[in-house]
Amino acid sequence: MDGFYEKAQQSAEYILSHSTLRPTCGIVLGSGLGSLVDKMTDKTIIPYADIPHFPRSTVAGHAGNLVLGTLAGQTVAALQGRFHYYEGFTMRQVTYPVYVLRLLGVRTLVITNACGGIDRGLAPGELMLLSDYINMLGSNSLMGPNDERFGPRFPDMTEAYSLRLRALAKSAAAELGIACKEGVYAIFPGPCYETAAEIRAYRALGADAIGMSTVPETIAANYLGLEVLGIACITNMATGIAERKHSHEEVLAVANRASADLCRLVERVIEKL
């Protein structure tokens, strides 16, 4: 083995040595969605750069902090910034924080992202619960040697996104008056945006939204035995559907505007756990 388990243990031990909190819920915050940490109390903020073996965020809108604290009565660990395959990270590096969260004691993982809408029934600024995913990366975050201390060689993905958590999220959205649809999320390697022809192909495969993250973490979390909820913030319509060219600035601007609804929804879901 390559010492991956031991490295994750060292990361977890460092984090636990800096806080008395023991999180049971983890949150991955996508582009422009890091403001949820403002709602947390009793916070301990640990920069990724300080944690042994942790990768470093390089994309605008990803602060690069692990935040331990209390939210809606639950002890949570929030990843304020994620790692993407297109940044040149290996799949192990992209998903490394999820393994560390598991060793911290996390059993429920809420993954958020900013993505493009393929379903014309979606609109920028709306939220979509992930019901399933389509992995078109040509790679999988579990490839390589398997360590049974983490999970099985061949994990099942029948319910990649928990039916129980999706029901909680639908109930929470209804209570808060937040429009929240459900759909299939497809991952695209990036960093360039998709072509119109690619979007037509993804639509034919059944994708409702598309982005450059989330699926590797989802796979790793299921492998580790975590219950997963995925929430996408639609920041733009996909190529061939949108009337103008895409930019990361546009994504961040819409994500920032929609972050209030996302924060309210995540907070209410965590309250219901």
What is the meaning of each model-derived region?
Residues 146-185:
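Metal-dependent peptidase/peptidase-like ectodomains
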Residues 1-157:
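Metabolite-binding pocket within alpha/beta catalytic cores that recognizes anionic/polar moieties
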Residues 107-108, 208, 227:
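Short acidic/polar active-site loop segments enriched in Thr and Asp
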Residues 102-105, 203, 222:
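Non-catalytic positions within long, well-ordered alpha-helices that form the structural scaffold/packing
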